[in-house]
Amino acid sequence: RSRGLGDVYKRQDGDGLEFILLKDGAKTGIKFRGVPNGHEFTSLLLAILNSDGKGKNFPDESICNRVKALNGSIHLTTYVSLTCTNCPDVVQALNAMTTLNPQIHHEMVDGAINQAEVDALKIQGVPSVFADGKLIHVGRGEFGELLSKLEAQYGINESLTEKTVKRYDVVVVGGGPAGASAAIYSARKGLSVAVVAERIGG
C-alpha cells in the first residue's frame, strides 16, 4: 500500500494490478498501479527511456540540481484518469524527478480501478498528487511548479545546490505566442536564449 495512506484506506479494487520499473535488477523508484495505456502510455515509455539514460524530457542542469538537492526520502502518489489530458505532464515530471533523485519514489495510480481508495481520500479531480499522504497538488502542473511545491514541503540541502551564472544573448520575458516566437526566431539565428515564464503557451 502507499506510504502515508494506510490509516485512510485498505486497498480493495485494484489489488495486485501494479508493476515497478527495474534497471539492472534494481528498483528505479517508479511504480505504476494500473495499466498505463491511453494518455499514460507515453508516461511509461518516457520512464523506461529516462531510466536507461536515453530520455529527452529533462530540464536544464540548474533545475536538475534543484531536484537532486531535495531533502529526505520522498514518497509521491499521483491519482490519474487514463482519459485525462493534463495527467501525463504531471506523471512524467514526477517520474523524471524520481530518475534524478534516488530518494524520490513515485507511484501512478489509475483511479478508475482503485475507486474505493479515491473515495476514501475524497479526491475530487485529477491529477491529484500526494506527498507522504498529504495532498500537495491538483490539476494541471508544470515541472517547475511541482518542484517548488516539493521544495516548500521538504526543504533543500544547500550543500548540493550549485550557484551558477549563465550568460545569454537574449532573455524573453513571457511564454505566450509572441514570447515563444521571439525565442524561436532568436535561437534560429544562433543566439543563446532564455525564456522566463510560468508556463509556455501563455
Task: Kindly label every feature range from the protein language model.
Residues 98-106, 112-169:
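Extreme N-terminal leader/targeting segments of oxidoreductases
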Residues 11-30, 118-132:
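Structural micro-motif
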Residues 22-54, 130-157:
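Non-catalytic, surface beta->alpha helical segment in thiol-disulfide oxidoreductase systems
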Residues 54-69, 158-164, 169-170:
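Long, charged amphipathic helices and adjacent flexible linkers at domain junctions
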Residues 3, 88-100:
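Typically the conserved alpha-helix immediately C-terminal to a functionally engaged Cys/Sec
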Residues 77-82, 86-88, 120, 165-202:
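Beta1-alpha1 glycine-rich phosphate/pyrophosphate-binding loop at the start
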Residues 7, 106-108, 195:
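A structural preference for short, hydrophobic beta-strand core positions in alpha/beta folds
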Residues 2-9:
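Short, small-residue-biased leader/transition segments that mark boundaries at the very start
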